[in-house]
Amino acid sequence: MPAIESGLWALILTGVLGYLLGSIPFGIVITRALGLGDLRKIGSGNIGATNVLRTGNKPAALATLLLDSGKGAIAVLIARAAVGEDAAQLAAFTSFLGHLFPVWLGFRGGKGVATFLGTLLALAWPVGLACCLTWLATAALGRISSLSALVAAASGVLWMILLGYGQMAALGAVLAVLIFIRHHANIRRILAGTEPRIGKK
């Protein structure tokens, strides 16, 4: 963790801003705007890009991926520019929580993978890029989105240490644990060999 140097109110404001940005459910907004139905009643019921892909609309899935990752990145960049590095890491955490527990959806949100990657790209782009490449490599080999997410999340702390961003390791560990918790049902299906592959409805 970075040294806490910013004032309490500055940290509170950037934390709240991060949460509000993170809680925007772009998957639901996009699928409703395109007349694709209620995403919570499609496929896995998750509000993220992988489930949007199950509607068969690839542009909608891509837009969801970019916006879900972008909201985390924007929260970090605003906090860093306006306050400092301590606020940036706080905004990364609260934007991630916002995606997982959005107030607009009764605190029932997504699994946070895209937002996780977006915050890492903004906090330290080499770490974010390494995690994105880890996701892509795992997806190419296994064709299972949830497995790719778990491997990318687990590798985050390792990449932080190897690439010289050890001050982010505590944040990375917390985010990884939350991702694993949100994927508990996926983990059971992976172990049982019943987890759907990418592109399957």
UniProtKB/Swiss-Prot annotation:
GO terms for cellular component: plasma membrane. The keyword Cell membrane applies. One of its GO terms (biological process) is phospholipid biosynthetic process. It is an enzyme of class 2 (transferase). GO terms for molecular function: acyl-phosphate glycerol-3-phosphate acyltransferase activity. Its EC number is 2.3.1.275. The chain crosses the membrane at residues 10-30, 59-79, 87-107, 116-136, 161-181. Keywords: Cell inner membrane, Cell membrane, Lipid biosynthesis, Lipid metabolism, Membrane, Phospholipid biosynthesis, Phospholipid metabolism, Transferase, Transmembrane, Transmembrane helix. It comes from the Bacteria. Its main location: membrane. Pathway: Lipid metabolism; phospholipid metabolism. It catalyses: an acyl phosphate + sn-glycerol 3-phosphate = a 1-acyl-sn-glycero-3-phosphate + phosphate. It is found in: Cell inner membrane. It is a multi-pass membrane protein. Catalyzes the transfer of an acyl group from acyl-phosphate (acyl-PO(4)) to glycerol-3-phosphate (G3P) to form lysophosphatidic acid (LPA). This enzyme utilizes acyl-phosphate as fatty acyl donor, but not acyl-CoA or acyl-ACP. Probably interacts with PlsX. Belongs to the PlsY family. This is Glycerol-3-phosphate acyltransferase. It comes from Cereibacter sphaeroides (strain ATCC 17023 / DSM 158 / JCM 6121 / CCUG 31486 / LMG 2827 / NBRC 12203 / NCIMB 8253 / ATH 2.4.1.).
